[in-house]
Amino acid sequence: MKLKLNWESALLALLIAEILLFGALNPRMLDINMLLFSTSDFICIGIVALPLTLVIISGGIDISLGSTIGLCAIALGVMTQAGWPLWLAVSLTLLLGLLCGLFNAALIHYTGINPLVITLGTLYLYGGGALLLSGMAGATGYEGIGGFPDSFTAFANLTLGGLPLPLVLFAIITFFFWLLAHRGRFGRHLFLLGQNPRAARYAALSVNGIPYVLYGLVGVASAVAALVMVSYFGSARSDLGRDLLMPALTAAVLGGANIYGGSGSILGTALAALLVGYLQQGLQMVGIPNQVSSALSGALLVVVVMGRSLSLHREWVRATWRRLFSHKTIGA
């Protein structure tokens, strides 16, 4: 717990240092209103990174979430375009996200194939479905489907207590997942499953049932992200979630999730999501192209994974270092 608290404190310090650094380059970065309301640009990274953290803790992975967002977004647009009531379209969008997640879990359960391979396949399946729906609706390219009610598009711009509503929603979701992962029996079962699946089976845990809950949560969170993004941009497009996978995965791993399973922190992921989001925002404000920002996110993920791997095998690293150093000393 102390180590986890220290890591989360380090992430908070890094977040503050990042804001101050970009603020020195562009003073607008230090404006409190800009800091608060710019979160609407990237808060969906955190919304999907939180359940993704749970999946990683369990020893799984889901790389189809970006396509799930696109499919849910365009499905919402098609239903709204057809004149369906908004409450029904939103409800069915959430249901679609849940079904996508459950379908991933079912494929993993019944085939026994690695989750990375399964979700890679469904990434293309859901992405293709989104493009098909988009084409059928006549929403090609970057046009998307518009015409949403003002009550829906206003959501992303509303405030509650002076805070943007999407940021408040993210805080509520963070608290929910924190309770789920760190303050209950389900969380203990989750960590045991990731650390030792065989022991989890011997303990009579629902080893096959837990992934359905986890991947279902990723699906629902992807649908929520789709709703927030459509409200924010005012149009539904099949490519809305295309660029969210890498930042979300980076946030989960940077936040403390072990890519091999068995450890992770919801609060760490939430802080890391803000860290990654403000990194992208700050780079844009100082004139760095989006391509460079994406490359830096990828590089950050590689560095974090390498660091985690070295920490897990630190004894081997130390032994190798001593062996190499002793050889050099003898040769001298």
Swiss-Prot record:
Keywords: Cell inner membrane, Cell membrane, Membrane, Transmembrane, Transmembrane helix, Transport
This protein's GO CC annotations: plasma membrane
Topological relation to the membrane, as annotated: Multi-pass membrane protein
Transmembrane spans: 5-25, 43-63, 83-103, 116-136, 160-180, 210-230, 259-279
Record's signal peptide: none
Subcellular location, principal: membrane
Gene Ontology molecular function terms on file: transmembrane transporter activity
Superkingdom, natural source: Bacteria
InterPro entries: ABC_transp_permease (IPR001851)
Cited CDD domains: TM_PBP1_transp_AraH_like
Location within or outside the cell: Cell inner membrane
Assembly and oligomerization: The complex is composed of two ATP-binding proteins (LsrA), two transmembrane proteins (LsrC and LsrD) and a solute-binding protein (LsrB).
Similarity section: Belongs to the binding-protein-dependent transport system permease family. AraH/RbsC subfamily.
Function of the molecule: Part of the ABC transporter complex LsrABCD involved in autoinducer 2 (AI-2) import. Probably responsible for the translocation of the substrate across the membrane.
NCBIfam families for the chain: PRK15038.1
The name this protein goes by in its record: Autoinducer 2 import system permease protein LsrD
Organism: Klebsiella pneumoniae subsp. pneumoniae (strain ATCC 700721 / MGH 78578)
Gene: lsrD
